[in-house]
Amino acid sequence: MSCTAKSAPDFLKKSVIYQIFLRPFTPGGTLQSAFRMLPYLSELGADILYLCPPMVADDDVRLEFWSDRQKKCALNNPMNPYRLKDYYNVDPEYGTNEDLKKFVAGAHELGMRVILDLVYYHCGPTPVFLKEHPDFVVRDAEGRVKNG
C-alpha cells in the first residue's frame, strides 16, 4: 500500500501564516489585546493566524509531569499550553470563551482564517475529561496516571 499526501489548496500555498502565543504576543497577553492587534496583522499581510492553545492549562505542580523544558526554566510555572487540563474552555489567563469567539469573528471580518492549535496526543495529569473517561490514559499498577 502506498500513501500520497494531498496537495495543499492554492489559498494555503499563497498564504502568510502568523503564529500567536498569547502570553508574549502583547503586553496584556490576552485574547482581548490580541483582538486589538488584528488590523495590524492584516496590514502585515497575514492571511492565517495560527493560535497556540488558549485553553485551560494544567496547573498540577508535581514535577514528574513537567516537560524537561519546564523543569530547566527558572520560572517554576506548571502552566504549559501544550499540557491541557480543559479542552473546552479558554484559560482565564487569556480571557473567556466569548473573547475567543470575538477574536475569531474579528479575524474573519478582516478576511483572515484562524487555526486553533490543540494537541490531543497528550495532556496534563489532571484533565477534566478523566472524571468521565478514566480509561483515556495509561495507568500504573496502583492506578496512578503514567507519564510519557
State each model region's role:
Residues 3-16, 22-32, 39-47, 54-148:
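Substrate-binding/active-site clefts of carbohydrate-active enzymes
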